[in-house]
Amino acid sequence: MLTQRQDNILHQIIHNYTNLGKPIGSKTLMEEGIAASSATIRNEMKTLEEYGLLVKPHSSSGRIPSLKGYRYYVDYLLEPEKLKKSEVDVMQQSLGKDFHEINDIIEQSAKILSKLTSYTALSIGPDVSNRKLTGFKMVPLNNRQVIAIIVTDKGNVENQVFSIPKSVDSEDLEKMVRIINDKLIGEPLLIVYQRLGTEIPMILHKYFQTTEGILDLFNNMLSEAFEEKIFVGGQMNLLNSDQIQNIDQFKSMLFMENSKQLNELLSTKDQPIQIRIGSELGNDLLSDMSLIQANYEIKDHGNGTIALLGSASMPYSKMLSLLDVFRQELAETLDDYYRSIDSFG
């Protein structure tokens, strides 16, 4: 552990650097209230550098935090910053709009959070495996194409454009949809998924010579409904990072397109709020970045996740507070949505 003065110096260097983006010297620290001479402060900064908590850029006499320094700060010195009422009001107004579908809320939450912070935001909605199927229909687009739609009891909607095989006429298609609805409406998606691989094909084959493509379509759409969707807001904000200095950092943009990697990134959900820095993110493309992840719970509807990804030099005290309040506001918005859905059920 550090001495009280070393704690104060490290705290002030990180606080100033995350806000100004410039190396911090002894003069600035004296102006910030560090009660010591310039020589003493420089000696303490040198000690912190030897501990691996600070780095001295070649072109400056000041110091900047290292990833290890940020980790120490987060673990021992970080104090959440109180948000202004106007900032909370903006959140509430942004999340208080009318939403018609659950995924719309989750997607918009990522965009709203990104706009509020100027960082990249990631959002995952509550678990959908306990949702029930309330409708499957096909709407004609032209002679050979339809849009297939699956709806659940909690407002999840999946749709996909489908070309009708020549061996299937429109009348047979309507009958197939009717049978699927008769047998599966009201069932949990997990049961629907299981029955789709067992008795439903047998039932359809009793009535039709071919079910070419229809069952595959329904199966694919259910897989989409089951998949934990991660919505990304402000992806281009990754390019605004001061840490981006070579082509490897630009590859982090492609990382945002890989849902499997994003799921792995957000797989740790054992704490309400957590901060991971650099190598803790488990991906070389994010080695100079930090992730602040907040989990929330919707009673009877499972858990969701909202997160911020950005430079390791982000202002943690402000971002931590903002994310904490945002997750509560998002949970309230989702709870209101579910209650409105339940009231119609």
UniProtKB/Swiss-Prot annotation:
A single GO BP: negative regulation of DNA-templated transcription
Keywords for this protein: Repressor, Stress response, Transcription, Transcription regulation
A GO term for molecular function: DNA binding
Highest taxon in the source lineage: Bacteria
Family matches, as InterPro entries: GAF-like_dom_sf (IPR029016), HrcA (IPR002571), HrcA_C (IPR021153), WH-like_DNA-bd_sf (IPR036388), WH_DNA-bd_sf (IPR036390), WHTH_HrcA_DNA-bd (IPR005104), WHTH_transcript_rep_HrcA_IDD (IPR023120)
Function: Negative regulator of class I heat shock genes (grpE-dnaK-dnaJ and groELS operons). Prevents heat-shock induction of these operons.
Family: Belongs to the HrcA family.
Entry protein name: Heat-inducible transcription repressor HrcA
UniProt organism field: Tetragenococcus halophilus (Pediococcus halophilus)
Gene (UniProt): hrcA
